[in-house]
Amino acid sequence: DWQLLNNSVFNHKGLIDIREYDKEQVIHPEDVIDLTKQVDSNGCLSWEAPSGNWTIIRMGHTSTGRKNCAAPDTGVGLECDKFSKQAIQLHFNKMMDLLYPLIKPYVHQIQIGLEIDSWEVGMQNWTSGFEDEFCERTGYDLIRYLPAMTGKIVGSKEITERFLWDIRRIQADLLADNYYGEFRSLCNQYGLVSYCEPYDRGPMEELQIGSRV
């Protein structure tokens, strides 16, 4: 199930393993063309396609739209981008602008901590600059394999599943480094103890995120 393999579905109840597929529908990586530079600022594509049959896939990303659920009405808002240090820094510092003046007199007298509770925000599988992080961490460019994110077979079933494994690996690493790890760093800056509940079904490796906090 490609939606499970690219982490676009949450709380998935079963696997659908399609063992048979038409080999004529396999996409060869060398046949994939990156048309990004042919798209203008209005999102219009200008491209003179070579002869033959082509499928154009337009890919982008946006907020997941998920809101925090364990909060009073005045504290409900969009969840931050869990793969971005800048996102958690913005949320954390905005909160501390209001909270820290109240707890500052007690920080060095008693133990005060902040906690990330269990994962209840659905799935996330992309962030701004993900393609660059992927290349840096894996050593290869993902562009020619991106159709696999839409359920296409690229190269072969084995190659496709290996690529999607790499996708999940980088997602987990970004979550551990840029969210949980950065949370601990921010807590340390304020003299606070960091805690987390490192579990539930999300784009993470539970022991990895627990070790970051």
Which sequence ranges carry the predicted segments?
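Mature extracytoplasmic enzyme cores
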Residues: D1-W165, D173
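Short, well-ordered coil/turn segments that N-cap beta-strands
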Residues: H108-I112, N188-S194, V213
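Substrate-binding cleft/loops of secretory-pathway carbohydrate-active enzymes
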Residues: S118-S128, Y195-V213
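Long, structured ligand/cofactor-binding scaffold of large enzymes
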Residues: R162-Y190, G202-V213
